[in-house]
């Protein structure tokens, strides 16, 4: 085709010429060009030019098309990548001779082709990129399409379900519509009937209104008449009341006499109980000691481990020696490690002195003395019991039937390691004390033959002395109670979780407790923690070979665990953590025992006993819920002979007898040898066998080791002075003399050996150096010596254990600290991948872990100030301490390091339930709690319940929940004491918390808070006590909340957002959740209730009274919040009226002494309360508040307004004169409200005329709402101070708050009795009581300032006012107030002193010494009160005092007092002449107090220089005396130390004329007015001893007949229960008998 197109090219080029010629010929034929005009020629030319241009365009198009066709057909079939091949082919197949070639130059063709190829390549690449982008879009669209299709299918299915549901709903709705339509028709018919009835009722009401208006007019007239009659009745009523009170008092006296006689008869029958009462604590103490000894007896172990077998009690008298071991536990580790849970090792349980065994039976009941059962019967349900083996101290040979099977066992005990800190001076060696007179070789023979039957016992308990008894009752009781509870549960669990083990596979007894450090344990039980932990239910089982409990020596406090040798869980033998002190026991069947790899003493030559030296291999049993090292692993302990590889070796502490004379015996672990016994030491075979020392016939090097092991400094120094002695000689196990001395903690021996240049780093066959074994045993003084001699502190034993690792396993804080200060490496790992942190966590020792994490060391080795944080800094709930915890020094990699099984330290702590350790680890910022072990388990998966809760709260947001009352309107009353916001709790928001949970938590917290602050006691907010109640007793609940603010965003309960609460609060950085209470702005009073602690229902009632009666006056003692209540009610009314569409205005007017009636008229007129008669009433609501009305006369100020206020209409106008002299008629309209406040307890005189025209609201201090207001207010302040938590009732803050509350109540109670109602105080002054945790002195100082500034001046003014009531009115009374007489001053000072001691200082929780320092700050506290009685003798016949209060009275409290005056000289011969202060006799016995009560009679003397000027003064004196002696008030021994202080006073008849003004008060109920009883006060005070409480309860001032004084004094305790008081109405020096119905002589009971 290319050839054809090429051949056609000339023809195409000639075609235009031929066409043009043909056109010209045709033109010539048609017309002549010459004949054409010029215009025609131009047209012809233009046509021809157009044709030429068209031809050129056609030619160009054809050429381009030809070129494309040519290239496509010539080269389209070939690869364009090789153009030379195409050129060569075209050239060879070129055109023939007749055809003209297209191009003679191939290079030009190549260039053209290349240029074309470049353009095509660019175009193709662009198209390829576009195609790829389109392909990607297409793929994405396909994926989206698939997702949409799936979603469409789901939605379609859901739609079908919804359609089905909707159909069902529609059908139901249709049915309901039909039903409702029928109901609508019925309701319409009923409505018509009701409307008809309503019309009839309206007609009836209109008629009733007319009748009521008429009745109202009649009733107003009748009320006026009734008020007049009431005023007349008042006087008569008070007279009758006084008469009734006298009769009641006399009746009460007679009842008391009967009660006392009955009680005295009962007491006479029972005899004097004083001495038995004193001995009671001792008896109790003895019982406690007995129970402590029971905790370590064989029968206890039997009951726990065996539960079926009976232990034969030995009767050997030699074995009943008492044992006393002083204890000084190491401070580095807890007495009872956390994972032992109070279990006692068999050593502690079995070897006991006989006297303890007796006490055990006395406490637990008799045990039948049967023989020990055979081994076949000793396979108990809980595995082999250590309690069944005969006690070594009771070494009577057992029956043959039990001997042979026991010998067949393969028990083993780990090398006994004792690391008791240096204070056990005398320890019991039961074997040595068994037969002290026998030859040592005979004892050895007995030991051997007896041993076969006692293998488990010997191996575990051979020389174990029993735990010392702690005589401290506090620690004893707490420990016994806690461990008894734990062990009861553990025992029950172990019975069902421990599989049975045959006698053939029984192992040796597990390590027991250290005799020197074992705390007293009560009725301990066996513990198999692995059973409880492994069977937790976590998905995979705990992996084997877990180094959970190491094969290293344990802390100086032994792990108290009586391990069951046969108890296995998932083929894992559980064993206790390693114990202490190196003594060894040899196993009978050693063919099954692997070689020991622990630090041990040299072997004992050729005495084949059941007990071998510490150098011999001994198997041990250990407990671990995680796993164990392989049995062959070298370590400080030897695995038990068991078919299971999961055995954890442990060590048992054996204590040998050491002569206390030796000063070098720093540790009880040393033992005696025959050689040493010859030199004066007490001989003991068992310690010799156990100590690892050689026999007397051994060589010198072995003797050197024995001396070092025993701590015999004298023998050691003698041997070191010999020439040629190898001090570095090692026995077969590699134990050198330095090793033995360091292992036993003999510091002097270590020092001697080091000075003699012994090798400091000589290791045994397992690689343990003396430093290693000293760290393992907790001998920090040896560590200090060894490090000073450059011992290798980073030496690793065969298993990789470093001294620091071993010290952490031991838990000795001092050892760890010394090693850290020496610069040891904390990151060295053992062969199993454990670090020292693993070891510290495995033992549950928090102090060790803190030291590892926080102890910093300077470069030169000296430690910085210890930066280990206190325990309080690690409370996840409490947040950081004020100073902040220090930064840990260990890196995150070390904290998160995992062992071979993938377990980190956090895994170990969580699986064992060591919450404190886990908490410390969680404080490290780099901890990874999600790290998984080889079984794919996280820390949370293996954690106990407590630890799971801790981990769940690890990342919880702690946001305070606060409650706000909004803005508090400023007023004169207590607005400064009210806070706007209060913290009620802290919300823990976890990641999984939902909005529903969040809503419930907020609602529950608010409900609990309202309940807690309004309850009677100090309840915890977490208590379930309030969960059932919806509203508190103050009326607040969740419905009182207006809205809740999450930071700045409003939220309502039940509302949810797309984010979870945790994400939402963290993203918004919410710092607090604020609950806003509904307030007056919303027309509610909830915020007012919360701010003032006045119950909501009472506030709503007050509001109803104001709205209904329009004229209301609030009155009560000063400080009763009258002004605050009035202002808040006015605000609430204002916003309510405004919400209803009425304008409202509040007008406040403060009344003072110069406020006149004209000013009040001006206020009323100016604010449109008084409207001219001609003017129409306004729609505006006006609330007028008149404050401080007590400063003016009510009758003068409001007298002219009474009628217009009562009848508000134009029919009752009132004419008032203006300032310009003109007068006009006004009236009060219905939209005016008048609210007044009076700071006065009661009205007097002419003010009573105003009473009937107003609605009065009395705020009494002894009734709600004022009675409980202060208690609720202070409790809320405490809650806010403690950030939402209520402290315990015994907390000093609670005590000081209760004291402040009791001061207010007792003050008012005493002032009411004194007849001075004007001095009563409302709670306002006490609202500012400071609540400072830990600083009770601040509250006492505040109280002294309040006393000096407010209370004392008011009391002084009130008493002077009463004392001058009968004097001339006017100037005389004023003068008496300004210049009181000497007698009045004495009365005032006496009253202040009595009030201070009875009401203020009584019950103060401060210690006596601190309180004595604070007393000086109170005015009037040091008044000699003997003058109070001075006027009684002068006024015997005056008859001027009245009985003020007859309310029931409570028992007196107890308080020490200043001095009283001389005793009665007439009775000095019969009784003691003086009485010491009660506070000097506080610790005396009760019998001594009772004897004093019989002997002492000190009466008040008279000061004749002081005279009282009126009968009222005498009345005050007698009332003060009555208060001194009254049981209704708190006892003030400060005032009434004398026994017969009131005996000389007379009482005369009441003067009605003078008593009338005083009798306006009503009696105060006992429950509200009286202070707490002495027993309650004593229980709340930490500073009072038991004896003091007993003495305070004996106080009584009741007069009794003379003949029964002795009986009363003997039976004071019973008589003190009488609750009523006998006022001093009888004067035994006068024949006149007042206040009584019969005449007989009465003598006052001695004042006790």
From Swiss-Prot:
GO terms for biological process: regulation of modification of postsynaptic actin cytoskeleton. The keyword RNA-binding does not apply. Signal peptide: none annotated. Residues 330-342, 372-392, 492-503, 1477-1492, 1548-1557, 1571-1584 have a biased composition (Polar residues). This is Cortactin-binding protein 2. Changing residue 599 to A: Reduced CTTN-binding. ANK repeats lie at residues 699-729, 733-762, 766-795, 799-828, 832-861, 901-931.
């Amino acid at each position: 085709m290319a050839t054809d197109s090429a051949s056609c090219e000339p023809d195409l080029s000639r075609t235009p010429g031929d066409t043009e010629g043909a056109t010209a010929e045709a033109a010539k034929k048609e017309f002549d060009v010459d004949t054409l005009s010029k215009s025609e020629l131009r047209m012809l030319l233009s046509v021809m030019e157009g044709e030429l241009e068209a031809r050129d365009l056609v030619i160009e198009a054809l050429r381009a098309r030809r070129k494309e066709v040519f290239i496509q057909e010539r080269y389209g079939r070939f690869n364009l990548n090789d153009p030379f091949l195409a050129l060569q082919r075209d050239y060879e197949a070129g055109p023939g001779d007749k055809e003209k070639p297209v191009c003679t130059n191939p290079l030009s063709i190549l260039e053209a082709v290349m240029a074309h190829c470049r353009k095509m390549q660019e175009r193709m690449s662009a198209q390829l990129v576009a195609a790829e982008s389109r392909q990607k879009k297409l793929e994405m669209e396909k994926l989206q399409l698939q997702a949409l299709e799936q979603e469409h299918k789901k939605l379609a299915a859901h739609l079908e379900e919804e359609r089905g549901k909707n159909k069902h709903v529609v059908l139901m709705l249709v049915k309901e519509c039909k039903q409702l339509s029928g109901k609508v028709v019925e309701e319409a018919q009923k409505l018509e009937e009701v409307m008809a009835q309503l019309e009839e009722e309206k007609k009836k009401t209109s008629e009733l209104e007319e009748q009521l208006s008429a009745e109202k007019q009649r009733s107003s007239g009748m009320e006026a008449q009734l008020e007049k009659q009431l005023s007349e009745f008042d006087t008569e009523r008070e007279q009758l009341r006084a008469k009734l009170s006298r009769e009641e008092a006399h009746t009460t006296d007679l009842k008391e006499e009967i009660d006392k006689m009955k009680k005295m008869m009962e007491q006479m029958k029972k005899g004097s109980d004083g001495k038995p009462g004193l001995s009671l604590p001792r008896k109790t103490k003895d019982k406690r000691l007995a129970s402590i000894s029971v905790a370590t007896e064989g029968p206890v172990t039997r009951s726990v481990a065996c539960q079926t077998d009976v232990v034969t009690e030995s009767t050997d008298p030699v074995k009943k020696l008492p044992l006393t071991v002083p204890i000084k536990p190491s401070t580095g580790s807890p007495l009872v490690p956390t994972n032992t849970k109070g279990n006692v090792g068999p050593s502690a349980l079995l070897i006991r002195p006989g006297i303890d065994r007796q006490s055990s039976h006395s406490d637990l009941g008799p045990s039948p003395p049967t023989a020990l059962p055979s081994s076949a019967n000793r396979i108990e349900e809980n595995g082999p019991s250590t309690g069944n083996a005969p006690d070594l101290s009771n070494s009577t040979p057992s029956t043959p039937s039990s001997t042979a099977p026991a010998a067949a066992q393969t028990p083993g005990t780990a090398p006994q390691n004792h690391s008791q800190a240096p204070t056990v001076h005398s320890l019991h060696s039961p074997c040595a004390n068994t037969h002290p007179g026998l030859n040592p070789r005979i004892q050895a023979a007995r030991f051997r033959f007896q041993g076969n039957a006692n293998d488990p016992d010997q191996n575990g308990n051979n020389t174990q002395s029993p735990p010392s008894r702690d005589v401290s009752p506090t620690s004893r009781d707490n420990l016994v109670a806690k461990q008894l509870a734990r062990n009861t549960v553990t025992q029950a669990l172990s019975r069902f979780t421990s599989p049975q083990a045959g006698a053939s596979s029984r192992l040796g007894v597990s390590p027991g407790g250290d005799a020197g450090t074992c705390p007293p344990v009560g009725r301990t039980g066996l513990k198999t923690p692995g059973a409880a932990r492994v069977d937790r239910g976590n998905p995979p089982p705990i992996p084997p070979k877990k180094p959970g409990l190491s094969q290293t020596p344990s802390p100086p406090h032994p792990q108290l665990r009586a391990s069951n040798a046969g108890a296995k869980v998932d083929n894992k033998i559980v064993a206790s953590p390693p114990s202490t002190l190196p003594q060894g026991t040899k196993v009978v069947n050693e063919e099954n025992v692997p070689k020991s790899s622990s630090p041990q003493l040299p072997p004992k030559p050729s005495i084949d006993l059941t007990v071998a030296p510490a150098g011999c291999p001994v198997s041990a049993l250990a407990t671990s819920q995680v796993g164990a090292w392989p049995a062959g692993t070298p370590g400080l302990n030897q695995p038990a002979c068991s078919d299971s590889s999961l055995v954890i070796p442990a060590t048992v502490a054996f204590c040998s007898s050491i002569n206390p004379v030796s000063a070098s015996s720093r540790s009880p672990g040393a033992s005696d040898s025959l050689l040493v016994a010859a030199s004066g030491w007490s001989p003991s075979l068992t310690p010799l066998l156990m100590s690892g020392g050689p026999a007397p016939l051994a060589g010198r090097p072995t003797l050197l080791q024995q001396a070092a092991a025993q701590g015999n400094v004298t023998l050691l120094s003698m041997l070191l002075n010999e020439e040629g002695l190898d001090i570095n000689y090692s026995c077969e196990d590699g134990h050198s003399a330095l090793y033995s001395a360091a292992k036993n903690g003999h510091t002097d021996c270590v020092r001697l050996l080091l000075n003699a240049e012994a090798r400091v780093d000589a290791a045994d066959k397992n690689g343990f150096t003396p430093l290693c074994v000293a760290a393992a045993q907790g001998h920090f003084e040896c560590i200090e010596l060894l490090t000073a001699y450059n011992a290798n502190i980073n030496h690793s034993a065969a298993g990789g254990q470093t001294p620091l690792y071993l010290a952490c396993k031991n838990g000795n804080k001092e050892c760890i600290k010394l090693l850290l200060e020496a610069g040891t490496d904390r990151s060295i790992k053992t062969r199993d991948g454990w670090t020292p942190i693993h070891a510290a966590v495995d033992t549950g020792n928090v102090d060790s872990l803190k030291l590892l994490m926080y102890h910093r060391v300077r470069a030169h080795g000296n430690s910085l100030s210890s930066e280990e944080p206190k325990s309080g800094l690690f409370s996840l709930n409490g947040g950081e301490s004020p100073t902040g915890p220090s930064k840990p020094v260990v890196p995150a990699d070390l904290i998160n390091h995992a062992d071979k099984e993938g377990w980190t330290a956090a895994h170990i702590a969580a699986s064992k339930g060591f919450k404190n350790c886990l908490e410390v680890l969680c404080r490290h910022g780099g901890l990874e709690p999600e790290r998984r072990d080889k079984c794919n388990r996280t820390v949370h998966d293996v954690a106990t319940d407590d630890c799971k809760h801790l981990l769940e709260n690890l990342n919880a947001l702690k946001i305070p929940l606060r409650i706000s009352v909004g803005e508090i309107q400023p007023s004169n009353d207590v607005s400064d004491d009210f806070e706007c916001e209060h913290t009620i709790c802290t919300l823990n928001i976890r990641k999984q918390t939902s909005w529903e949970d969040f809503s419930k938590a907020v609602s529950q917290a608010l409900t609990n808070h309202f309940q807690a602050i309004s309850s009677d006691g100090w309840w915890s907010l977490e208590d379930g006590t309030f969960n059932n109640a919806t509203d508190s007793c103050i009326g607040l609940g969740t419905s009182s909340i207006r809205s809740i603010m999450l930071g700045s965003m409003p939220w309502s309960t039940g509302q949810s957002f797309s984010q979870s609460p945790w994400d939402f609060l963290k993203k918004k950085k919410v710092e607090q959740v604020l609950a806003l209470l509904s307030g007056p702005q919303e027309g509610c009073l909830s915020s007012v209730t919360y701010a003032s602690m006045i119950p909501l229902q009472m506030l709503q009632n007050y509001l109803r009274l104001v709205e209904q009666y329009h004229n209301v006056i609030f009155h009560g003692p000063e400080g009763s919040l009258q002004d605050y209540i009035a202002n808040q009610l006015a605000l609430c009314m204002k916003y309510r009226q405004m919400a209803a569409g009425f304008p409202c205005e509040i007008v406040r007017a403060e009344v003072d002494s110069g406020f006149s009636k004209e000013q009040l008229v001006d206020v009323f007129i100016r604010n449109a309360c008084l409207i001219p008669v001609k003017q129409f009433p306004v729609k505006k609501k006006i609330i007028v508040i008149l404050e401080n009305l007590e400063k003016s006369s009510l009758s003068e100020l409001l007298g002219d307004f009474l009628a217009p206020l009562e009848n508000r209409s134009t029919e009752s106008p009132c004419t008032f004169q203006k300032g310009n002299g003109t007068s006009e008629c006004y009236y009060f309209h219905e939209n005016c409200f008048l609210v007044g406040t009076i700071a006065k307890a009661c009205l007097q005189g002419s003010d009573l005329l105003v009473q009937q025209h107003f609605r009065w609201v009395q705020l009494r201090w002894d009734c709600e709402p004022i009675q409980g207001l202060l208690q609720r207010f202070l409790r809320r302040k405490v809650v806010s101070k403690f950030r939402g938590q209520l402290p315990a009732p015994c907390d000093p803050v609670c005590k000081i708050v209760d004291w402040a509350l009791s001061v207010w109540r007792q003050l008012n109670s005493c002032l009411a009795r004194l007849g001075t109602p004007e001095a009563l105080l409302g709670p306002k002054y006490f609202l500012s009581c400071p609540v400072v945790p830990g600083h009770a002195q601040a509250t006492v100082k505040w109280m002294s300032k309040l006393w000096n500034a407010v209370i004392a001046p008011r009391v002084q003014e009130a008493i002077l006012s009463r004392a001058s009531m009968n004097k001339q009115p006017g100037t005389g009374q004023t003068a008496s107030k300004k210049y009181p007489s000497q007698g009045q001053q004495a009365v005032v000072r006496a009253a202040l002193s009595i009030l201070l001691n009875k009401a203020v200082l009584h019950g103060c929780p401060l210690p006596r010494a601190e309180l004595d320092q604070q007393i000086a700050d109170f005015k009037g506290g040091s008044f000699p009160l003997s003058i109070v009685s001075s006027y009684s003798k002068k006024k015997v016949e005056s008859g001027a005092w009245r009985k003020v209060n007859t309310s029931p009275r409570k028992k007196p409290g107890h308080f020490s007092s200043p001095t009283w005056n001389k005793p009665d000289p007439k009775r000095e011969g019969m009784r003691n002449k003086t009485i010491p202060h009660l506070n000097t006799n506080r610790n005396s016995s009760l019998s001594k107090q009772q004897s004093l009560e019989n002997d002492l009679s000190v009466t008040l003397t008279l000061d004749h220089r002081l005279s009282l000027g009126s009968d009222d003064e005498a009345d005050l004196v007698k009332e003060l005396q009555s208060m001194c002696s009254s049981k209704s008030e708190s006892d003030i021994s400060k005032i009434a130390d004398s026994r017969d202080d009131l005996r000389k006073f007379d009482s005369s008849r009441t003067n009605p004329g003078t008593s009338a003004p005083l009798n306006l008060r009503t009696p105060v109920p006992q429950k509200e007015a009286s202070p707490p009883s002495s027993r309650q006060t004593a229980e709340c005070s930490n500073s009072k001893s038991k004896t003091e409480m007993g003495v305070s309860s004996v106080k009584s001032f009741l007069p009794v007949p003379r003949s029964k004084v002795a009986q009363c004094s003997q039976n004071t305790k019973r008589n003190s229960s009488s609750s009523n008081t006998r006022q001093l109405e009888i004067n035994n020096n006068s024949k006149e008998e007042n206040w009584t119905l019969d005449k007989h002589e009465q003598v006052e009971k001695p004042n006790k």
